[in-house]
Amino acid sequence: MEIKNHFGVYGICLQDGKLLCIEKTRGPYQHRFDLPGGSQEIGEGLTETLKREVLEETGYTLISYCNPRIYDVLVHEEEQDFAVHHIMAFYDIVLDFEGSQKSLPHEVLDGSNDSANAIWISLEQLTEENASPLVLKVKAELRGFPELDKSSYMNWKVKHAKSTSS
């Protein structure tokens, strides 16, 4: 099986026991909660990527960032002949909620924006059924049990519709 590498930079913003997430609109994590962040542009530094992606996906400006760390996951989507080794740099972030929130762009330089809304979700509500592997890594870390080894999702189900709660 072919393995493709993907590297991204992501922000972790926790307030009152809730994690700031975005709702993915496309890709393997579509219709799931994910972290604000994404891929670097050519020549862009890690924190430049962090600032740009967080603004694009949440509408909020970054005030500060700290505590950089690296995690990774291997994701093999059902019915695909390849897997993605997703390597992620995480930063704890503080956002400017006092300033005005920018409207989210419909398009960004690399195509359509792949996120819809920024939303606060309690850690208890985040599960393998509704969250990306990135969010699950953060949840484990915040619970005091960081998963330092690579996590593997060998039959990852891409959700083709947003699930509704009963």
Give the role of each language-model region:
Residues 40-63, 73-131:
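Unchanged
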Residues 30, 62-65:
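Short secondary-structure junction motifs
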